[in-house]
A protein has these predicted regions:
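Eukaryotic N-terminal low-complexity, Ser/Thr- and Lys/Arg-rich leader segments
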Residues: 1-9, 59-70, 187-188, 242-250
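Beta1/beta-strand and adjacent pyrophosphate-binding region of the FAD-binding site
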Residues: 4-20, 36
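Structural signal for hydrophobic/aromatic residues that build the beta-strand cores
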Residues: 12-14, 25-28, 35-39, 118, ...
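Glycine-rich FAD pyrophosphate-binding loop
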Residues: 13-15, 29-54, 64-75
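Alpha-helical interaction elements in eukaryotic regulators
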Residues: 20-24, 52, 110-114, 213, ...
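Mobile amphipathic helical/loop "lid" adjacent to a hydrophobic cofactor/ligand pocket
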Residues: 82-245
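Active-site-adjacent "gating/activation" loops or surface patches in catalytic cores
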Residues: 237-262
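Helical element adjacent to the flavin cofactor pocket in flavoenzyme catalytic cores
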Residues: 253-295
């Protein structure tokens, strides 16, 4: 095959199959450029690589072969386990692809720039998606289930009545605030007139858009609701002290308009892990004439 390439000319050589390289390859190939893409590893993905159970077994074997000797360790005891023995029953059932170890887990909002690009580029034809069924967050010493809809909030056992009312009122306030300034990437029509139990919170949000989000939340909610809003609804770290109320509302609105698009939750995940994104882009590039080399 190498001889077949001797007389070929390429416009671009791309090294690696990370998400950025794969997306660039797909774009250039669709633009009629001649691409050759090389990855020194056996599989696609780079930093977004994921292993099924069999891949993980082989990866662990390679690690064991390259493990440093005990004599170099002063205060660490190496414990070797037979990975193959532990995984044997699962491997024999030929369902090893149902178990994935993702190096860099990623999910998509059902309505977002990324999901729109995947559909428009037809890369989505090469990916199978599942909806993320449940999301939990840690509060004190318990895992709490995050409700996604009005009905789920009402029946939640993790929130008391006052917390439910406050959370619903906050969600409706954000929707009402952002409905008048819908992002161009949103294709979801949301009701323009939303009834609020109390306009006070809506006015507080509207009049404090430049305030630090963490300060605003701590003023109006207890720690449980504050954590839920920051971690899940706005997809932020609890230590993010710089995010404003306006930025928080933008993030929450993106979350809310993705609910009930494909399922009750707003998130989509590739069935076989994040490397599916890079593989889809690579396949799209290959369909348009690119040549790939892996180890």
């Amino acid at each position: 095959m190498y001889k077949d390439l001797e007389d070929k000319k390429f416009d671009y050589l791309i090294l690696g199959t990370n998400l950025t390289e794969s997306a660039l390859s797909a774009y250039l190939a669709k633009s009629r450029y001649k691409i050759i893409q090389i990855d020194i590893t056996k599989s696609y993905g780079g930093d977004c690589k994921n292993f099924n159970l069999r891949d993980m077994e082989n990866f662990m074997k390679e690690l064991n072969e390259n493990t440093i000797k005990d004599s170099y360790l002063k205060n660490i005891t190496l414990i070797n386990r037979d990975i193959k023995k532990d995984a044997e029953p699962l491997l024999e059932k030929e369902n090893y692809r149902q178990y994935n170890f993702d190096l860099n887990p990623k999910f998509l909002y059902a309505k977002s720039k990324s999901s729109t690009e995947l559909i428009d580029s037809r890369a989505s034809n090469y990916i199978e998606f599942n909806s993320l069924k449940k999301i939990f967050f840690m509060y004190e010493d318990k895992f709490l289930n995050v409700p996604f809809s009005k009905s789920e909030i009402f029946i939640s056992n993790d929130l008391d009545l006052l917390e439910k009312q406050k959370l619903l009122n906050f969600i409706f306030s954000v929707m009402k605030l952002k409905n008048n300034n819908v992002d161009v990437n949103s294709t979801v029509d949301v009701k323009k007139d939303i009834e609020l139990d109390d306009d006070f919170l809506f006015n507080e949000i509207k009049n404090n858009l430049n305030q630090k989000a963490i300060e605003f939340l701590k003023k109006h909610f207890n720690d449980k609701i504050t954590d839920m809003i920051l971690l899940i609804l706005s997809n932020q770290n609890l230590n993010n002290m710089e995010m404003t109320v306006d930025q928080m509302c933008d993030n929450i609105y993106k979350f809310l308009i993705s609910v009930q698009i494909y399922d009750s939750t707003p998130f989509l995940i590739p069935q076989y892990g994040s490397s599916e994104f890079t593989q889809a882009m690579s396949r799209l590039s290959a369909v348009n004439g690119s040549i790939f080399f892996n180890k």
